Curated annotation (Swiss-Prot):
Organism name: Renibacterium salmoninarum (strain ATCC 33209 / DSM 20767 / JCM 11484 / NBRC 15589 / NCIMB 2235)
GO MF annotation, one: GTP binding
Lineage, broadest ranks: Bacteria, Bacillati, Actinomycetota, Actinomycetes, Micrococcales
Ligand binding (Mg(2+)): T26
SUPFAM superfamilies per the UniProt record, alphabetical: EF-Tu/eEF-1alpha/eIF2-gamma C-terminal domain, P-loop containing nucleoside triphosphate hydrolases, Translation proteins
Record protein name field: Elongation factor Tu
UniProtKB keywords: Cytoplasm, Elongation factor, GTP-binding, Hydrolase, Magnesium, Metal-binding, Nucleotide-binding, Protein biosynthesis
Length: 396
């Protein structure tokens, strides 16, 4: 058995297990961990089922989520795997973006086929922009009738297609997490096949650095004799000195040129994703720009006021509201670095939303914000967070 060596140059991919609560997500996660440890002991740590199953509570923006993080490697990639055991935990994790996924393994028990939660998870995966799903048909050892397995597979493929995933071509791998954990060679191989499918079919994520430049403005000040400087943390992309940029959001779009880039009082030729920097803007007055706008590569993002969103409303215990709200509720929506007031319209058939619920809603902001599908936001009242959501569709 050739030892694969640890290479930092391997692509890093975030994946997760999703699906109905009793279909064996956690068992499969433990099986993947064990099978890869046995196959590549130099690359992987030994993890037992109990350590994954006792998903620790995490606080993400004040929201309590039970979630397990497991790391493992194949020869080709390094994976960070999230497993949210409870249905509510999964929903919260997806909506709040606590753990972004580059792809997900939809776990469906061959004994049951897709259930209501399976459908809800697939819908949510599409809404929050999980780019790729593949399927683990778990508990396949318990179904002796091949035709029945084929039928369940067909049903799952139809479900994927109905939510705009590639149901025709997505890998569907028949596995048994439990048997693989017990070391049964046939089912150990099934988990190896599953991970090979993950390696081959989940596309390499586009790194933040390779996306078009975007920096939310946190602060604006004037340097006498030089002009206006905006500061913030570059969210994505790279920006070279003397590049043209646009300032988007809140006011009409302005075009300008970045004539200086500074970090920790040092002059730079380039700003990179993840760095805190100051950008000197040509011909822009201090009062022309404000916190909450973004500096971007021209044409890469547009300002919008009206959108559909999927939102989780904090429970009272999480420090949220104590009572429900209705349509026409007007809280603040905190995007990146600023609050903008917006009016909520609830979907037909939803009269009110209780603390602890998740819901879809339509929002009309009073000022435009640089927006794209999947953008996260917090809902706030008087400075405290009462909800967390993501843009699922831009209306105007």
């Amino acid at each position: 058995m050739a030892k694969a060596k640890f290479e930092r140059t391997k692509p890093h991919v975030n994946i997760g297990t999703i699906g109905h609560v009793d279909h064996g997500k956690t068992t499969l996660t433990a099986a993947i961990s064990k099978v890869l440890y046995d196959k590549y002991p130099t690359l992987n740590e030994q993890r037992d089922f109990a350590s994954i199953d006792s998903a620790p509570e995490e606080k993400q923006r004040g929201i309590t989520i039970n979630i397990s993080h497991v790391e493992y490697q194949t020869e080709k990639r390094h994976y960070a795997h999230v497993d949210a055991p409870g249905h509510a935990d999964y929903i919260k994790n997806m909506i709040t973006g606590a753990a972004q996924m580059d792809g997900a393994i939809l776990v469906v028990a061959a004994t049951d086929g897709p259930m209501a939660q399976t459908r809800e998870h697939v819908l949510l995966a599409r809404q929050v922009g999980v780019p790729y799903l593949l399927v683990a048909l778990n508990k396949s050892d318990m179904v002796e009738d091949e035709e029945l397995l084929d039928l369940v597979e067909m049903e799952v493929r139809e479900l994927l297609s109905s939510q705009e995933f590639d149901g025709d071509n997505a890998p569907v791998v028949r596995v048994s997490g439990l048997k693989a954990l017990e070391g049964d060679p046939q089912w150990v191989k099934s988990v190896e096949d599953l991970m090979e499918a993950v390696d081959e079919s989940v596309p390499d994520p586009i790194r933040d650095k390779d996306k078009p430049f975007l920096m939310p403005i946190e602060d604006v000040f004037t340097i006498t004799g030089r002009g206006t400087v905006v500061t913030g943390r570059a969210e994505r992309g790279t920006l070279a000195i003397n590049s043209e940029v646009e300032i988007v959001g809140i006011r009409p779009i302005q075009k300008t040129t970045v004539t200086g880039i500074e970090m920790f009082h040092k002059q730079l030729d380039e700003a990179w994703a993840g760095e805190n920097c100051g950008l000197l803007l040509r011909g822009i007055k201090r009062e022309d720009v404000e916190r909450g706008q973004v500096v971007v590569k021209p044409g890469s993002i547009t300002p919008h006021t009206d959108f559909e969103a999927n939102v989780y409303i904090l429970s009272k215990d999480e420090g949220g509201r104590h009572n429900p709200f209705y349509s026409n509720y007007r809280p603040q929506f905190y995007f990146r670095t600023t609050d903008v007031t917006g009016v909520i319209t609830l979907p037909e058939g939803t009269e009110m939303v209780m603390p602890g619920d998740n819901t879809e809603m339509t929002v009309a902001l009073i000022q435009p914000i640089a927006m794209e599908d999947g953008l996260g936001f917090a809902i706030r009242e008087g400075g405290r967070t009462v909800g967390s959501g993501r843009v699922t569709k831009i209306i105007k």
